[in-house]
């Protein structure tokens, strides 16, 4: 229906930092629930910009979802179908019945709340012992990195093309704002420099 691609297959390699991590990788890859997803053969990454004293574990069936592109295209589709409403949800207007829910003039069988850490404001879920975390990422440019795969270490690095890479992510349990921070930028730059030599 949307006539475009959002899911891109790309290999993911987990940087293993010592013998113990390699042994843990072998143990995990032998488990029946994980064996289809974790390669039992460790890989060498032939990339001078990525320094590692040990091999990498390859995760199978990996890629990334371009969520921004998906959201934009799907929103446009729903608008064209007259099925999209953008407003602040008013919980007091939600009526739950045995066989349906009603919200203003909308009737449906089910409702899905996709609110992230906003669930604390949702009267149906604010009693759950869940706490949101804020994650930040950077887009960097590196002509020397030349990655065609995702690298996962203390951070992850995702190639975007044209020498651009997404680097992430931070985890902040205190700051719940939508604003980027210099603290997160510094953390990501330092981890990127330590985990990989980005020339």
Specify the residue positions occupied by each region the protein language model found.
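Dinucleotide-binding Rossmann-like beta1-alpha1 core, especially the glycine-rich loop
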Residues: 1-48
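Active-site substrate-recognition segment that forms the wall
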Residues: 5-6, 114-199
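Short, well-ordered beta-strand micro-motif
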Residues: 14-16, 58, 139-141
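A short, surface-exposed helix-loop junction/capping segment
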Residues: 50-56
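Helical element adjacent to the flavin cofactor pocket in flavoenzyme catalytic cores
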Residues: 56-110, 114
């Amino acid at each position: 229906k949307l006539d475009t691609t959002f899911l891109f297959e790309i290999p993911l390699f987990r940087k293993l930092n010592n013998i113990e991590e390699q042994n843990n990788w072998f143990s995990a890859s032998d488990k029946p629930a994980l064996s289809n997803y974790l390669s039992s053969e460790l890989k060498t990454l032939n990339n001078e910009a990525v320094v590692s004293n040990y091999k990498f574990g390859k995760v199978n069936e990996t890629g990334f979802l371009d969520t921004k592109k998906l959201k934009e295209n799907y929103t446009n589709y729903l608008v064209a179908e007259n099925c999209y409403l953008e407003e602040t949800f008013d919980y007091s207007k939600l009526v739950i019945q045995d066989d349906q829910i009603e919200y203003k003039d909308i009737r449906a069988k089910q409702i899905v709340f996709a609110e992230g850490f906003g669930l604390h404001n949702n009267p149906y879920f604010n009693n759950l012992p869940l706490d949101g975390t804020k994650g930040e990422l950077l887009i960097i440019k590196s002509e020397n990195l030349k990655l065609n795969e995702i690298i996962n270490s203390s951070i992850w690095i995702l190639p975007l093309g044209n020498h651009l890479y997404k680097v992430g992510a931070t985890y902040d349990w205190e700051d719940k704002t939508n604003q980027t921070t210099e603290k997160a930028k510094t953390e990501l730059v330092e981890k990127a420099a330590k985990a990989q030599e980005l020339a």
